[in-house]
């Protein structure tokens, strides 16, 4: 409203909800909860409840008008008090990141191709209707777990099942990535129309997302990018406003509908396997670091170990197995989960129990310092509970009370961390969570990788040629003039290949491209 309706652009944006998520990532960021947490002894700093009195009331009487006015004033005062408390030790770079994240939404520079999305949505609706008609089964049967199971039984098909993660009981395994469901579909190819119809009915997400994109488009055709700062406790971004730009499939219509204005282009740059590189760096796994530094294909190299012959990029399936191993086994994944991951992936790869176990063993033997890192992370979990260990360091990390200080001044927090009956537990605002050495390793690596890419966002934003407009996982998207695009792209890639001071020997690599649409 302030920027797009009234035309007032603030010099700088602070966001106390975002700052709360950064300081207390496992806790609620609602103003009501924040003031209780920040000012536990000051009962005057408590959010009022007067707003409920105005629910459904269109015209406020003088008394209610005074109440709501006081409520609004108190909200502003409490928010400012929180800001004054939060700002004291909040890292400057993170404040710049909050400012940038806010501008992505309130000062949009991307355009949305509404006509493309409207046509796409209509096609999706028609495709669903055609699939349902071809299957000969009603939509309500296809969309219901219970009715679909009964329909399969009427066809003489045994319903695939899996263990419920919440109740522990056996339930129908109808997820499109459930191995038992995939196996059933492959066993009965004569019912392909039924499987296709079920997937279309249960996967209306594309249709729904297209409509949300359309609804979110501004009257001038611009599209504000809704990113949630510190959506995960590792600091990673997430979606908000019911729009998640973090999981747009490559080549999808939703992705290609995001465009640059005339005379401008999108600069899309992607950090190459940043987590695997960061893991090798923190573990001091020299062989893996050398491979990355020399630009060798680590996926092919590990696949060559698996298959006992030279694997190249031409061996797509074998390289995929090597890639899945490099990206998945670094966080303690066991052979059964690795087997299931290969089975449910694209392409789907079926390996035996013994083969999966052998690959896991090969990985841990080939890169022994990575399992050693898991053990060190277990030690750090104990250190976080021991006052005598506070202040000790491991690489760029410093031990605090139930937290690890990160090199950017933020922290990985584990509230109420404890060791009970042989397992580590901590609490979020919603649940109790179990953790262990490999899982802490994953948290640490993701947090460190996040710092690398968000610092790069700020560095790219400082370039006069471009404005950052989006960040997706390990990818940064900027917008700028089409003039001298190659030179601008080279500047962006140079930034993304330069490691920060706290890991100056980390071998980074990046690749990118230029387009008028987000189709890279």
Where are these regions (language model features)?
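C-terminal structured "cap/appendage" subdomains that terminate the fold
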Residues: 460-511
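Conserved "right-hand" nucleotidyltransferase catalytic core of DNA-directed polymerases
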Residues: 3-4, 26, 34-250, 263-265, ...
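Conserved catalytic core of nucleic-acid polymerases
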Residues: 158, 224, 232, 307-464, ...
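Short Gly/Ser/Thr- and Asp/Glu-enriched loop/turn motifs at secondary-structure junctions
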Residues: 15-16, 135, 143-147, 320-322, ...
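A short alpha->loop->secondary-structure connector
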Residues: 3-13, 27-32, 285-289
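Function-dense linear segments that define catalytic or interfacial modules
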Residues: 226-311
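Conserved beta-strand -> loop -> alpha-helix junction used to position metal-binding or nucleic-acid-contacting
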Residues: 8-24, 295-300
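Active-site palm subdomain of RNA-directed nucleic acid polymerases
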Residues: 86-97, 452-476
